Structures are given as C-alpha cells and as structure tokens.
A protein has these predicted regions:
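Domain-level marker for long, solvent-exposed, non-transmembrane regions
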Residues: 1-101
C-alpha cells in the first residue's frame, strides 16, 4: 500500500485509536546522551519522559565508530524509545474502551 493511500484510510477511521500525535502530546521531555566506551565505541541514548512519570529508553550505536553522527544516533535512538509507547498506549485505550461497555 502506498503512503498516500494508507494516510487516506487512516484519516477515514472514526473509532478511537492511538496516533503518533496522541502519544507525542503525552511526552514531557526528551533527553539524549552521546557516550563513548573505554574500548572506543560510540552510542546515543534517548530517554523519553512522559507527563505521568513513565520513561522509555532507546539506544543506537554504529558498527564502526567512524560512522558515529550525533544527529543520526538521536534519530534512531528516539525511534527505539518511541516504539514501545505504541503498545502501552494501545493497551490503555483498550482498557478504557472495555470499561465503557
């Protein structure tokens, strides 16, 4: 399915659902830490702090330290920290919907 077709279908859905925007609205702050290991490895840690106090972390590291780029590390570590929030928010929505019955 092409991206445009997917976005159209998602836009037509009327039932409650978790969206990227709904998750982002619950984020309090995002912090990044670039780090080096004693053996010369490099990596980036992302910590997403939610408004309710929950934290989600993601880590990214290149196979070769010569490929380390802070912006790339932040991008991938953020994705890894954000991904588990979909499942958690989906569970919360399902729990809420089940109580409405």
């Amino acid at each position: 399915m092409e991206q445009a077709e997917l976005e159209k279908k998602l836009g037509e859905m009327k039932a409650p659902r978790v969206t990227e925007e709904s998750i982002k609205a619950k984020i309090d702050r995002v912090d990044y830490m670039s780090m080096a290991t004693p053996s010369g490895g490099m990596g980036t840690l992302c910590v997403i702090s939610m408004k309710n106090g929950w934290i989600s972390t993601g880590f990214s590291a290149p196979a070769s330290k010569s490929n380390f780029d802070p912006a790339v590390g932040e991008h991938y570590s953020y994705q890894k920290a954000f991904e588990p929030l979909w499942q958690l928010e989906g569970y919360l929505l399902k729990e809420s919907l089940s109580k409405d019955k």
